[in-house]
Swiss-Prot record:
Protein's name in the database: UPF0391 membrane protein Meso_3392
Membrane-spanning parts: 4-24, 33-53
Membrane topology (UniProt): Multi-pass membrane protein
Keyword Cell membrane attached: yes
Coiled coil: none
Tagged with keyword Membrane: yes
Organism annotation: Chelativorans sp. (strain BNC1)
Family: Belongs to the UPF0391 family.
Primary localization: membrane
Lineage, opening ranks: Bacteria, Pseudomonadati, Pseudomonadota, Alphaproteobacteria, Hyphomicrobiales
GO cellular component terms attached to this protein's record: plasma membrane
């Protein structure tokens, strides 16, 4: 999933440099959503490990 975040960030950067602002915005929105999902899963994993210990 981290690979997809990096790909979307690169697409957003390139699209922004080329003047395709709507594509850049869409790619950034996708990256933000994936970052939120990764953070939630990370917190759930950490809390699960703490609860087991």
């Amino acid at each position: 999933m981290l690979k997809w975040i990096l790909i979307l960030l690169i697409v957003a950067a390139v699209a922004g440099l080329l003047g395709m602002h709507s594509l850049a915005g869409a790619a950034m929105t996708g990256a933000k959503i994936l970052i939120a999902i990764v953070l939630i899963l990370f917190l759930l994993a950490v809390l699960g490990i703490i609860a087991i210990a």
